Amino acid sequence: MVKKKYALLIVLLCSAAFSMAQEKRGMIGFGISAGATNYEGELDGNFTLQYTRLGFGVHTTALFFPRLHVRLAYLHGRIGAHDGGLFSTNNRRNLDFFSDIDELSLVFMYKFQNRKRGFTKRNFVTPYLFAGVAGFMFDPKTTYNGQTYELQKVGTEGQYLDGSYPKPYKLQQVSIPFGIGFMVKVTQNFDFGGECGFRKTFTDYLDDVSTNYPDRDQLRAQQGEIAVELSDRSNDPAAHGKVRGNPRNMDWYVYTNLHLTYYITTSLFKSYKLKNQFKDNSCKHLMTPKKL
């Protein structure tokens, strides 16, 4: 139910934003991005470069005003880390994970440029800020003795046990994306740029590590021996109840990328309502309907 509510909210926001943009401003862009993804959590507290993975995305951008744009984007990336890393402070715990991230985001972009310039006469280099809302899916996994396991299904912190253990966490979550970027005008229709965007999540389980070690005997009885092995890789027989993670600190992930965007006018959609977007008539030729 919660997942459906978030999906409906994003759909409604997208519909309203892009309908307004096409009706009033008449400029829309389509683009691609590629770059690096990383994470911060129990297994890596500093977005360590060692754990950087590749990510890519597609996006569409609608122009409200010269300084305000709205962007709908899809991102696919991967995050991961392990306790045996170069800067790890918890080698004894000996845990590791990796997870794909699939994200759909809606953000507002504020560009630092001259409001009186038309689109084709926009600044050569334009910095911007952005913030919005996103829904994403993840699924932490690990490889043990040559086999890959989905950790959420294992219940490494006793999620499927009887008693006062945490409930199984959802693999669909919401995040708050925000960051900074820049755009470089390549041609009248093309922009090339770079961006660094952080995602604040509301889950501490991107890495499947959050609370305490469960009772080994109870975990073995209800989930099997493999659950015990994946829960406690330190082989500490007295681990029950000891701290495994920190539930007070939610996990983060970041996407740093280069992107390319191609802009078209809504004259392609037989709409010529561009006067507010292009106050200096720099795109007047784009607003004139072709003669039959």
Q: Model-found features: residue ranges?
A:
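Bacterial Sec-dependent N-terminal signal peptides
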Residues: 1-26
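Primarily recognizes Gram-negative and organellar outer-membrane beta-barrels
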Residues: 22-55, 63-102, 120-122, 135-175, ...
